[in-house]
């Protein structure tokens, strides 16, 4: 099945991902699954499976910045979708594009980096 969404990553996201991949070896596969089971369900098929939450204060008519809270990580056995890994991304309505902005582990960082999101929006 081909994706209807084009995916991109910020350099900061790539650093986050690389750092977490050392700790959680299944992240690459887990992210691919999240693209289909969460992002495409929510934005394309309009199915809300309660894993994605828009971040207030960062949504416009053109961009919706969201947080994936329910992210299943196989490397964290027994935790299922409550892995504690969070992904912040921006969905661009006009060209059906997702840019991954941030990935973090809740055990190391409490919340998203709002300044990073602000900078992303300013540069979009």
Feature roles, as predicted:
Residues 88-92:
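Short conserved beta-strand segments at catalytic cores or DNA/RNA-binding microdomains
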Residues 1-81, 94-98, 106-124:
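Basic, Lys/Arg-enriched alpha-helical interface segments
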Residues 82-87:
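Short, surface-exposed coil-to-beta transition loops
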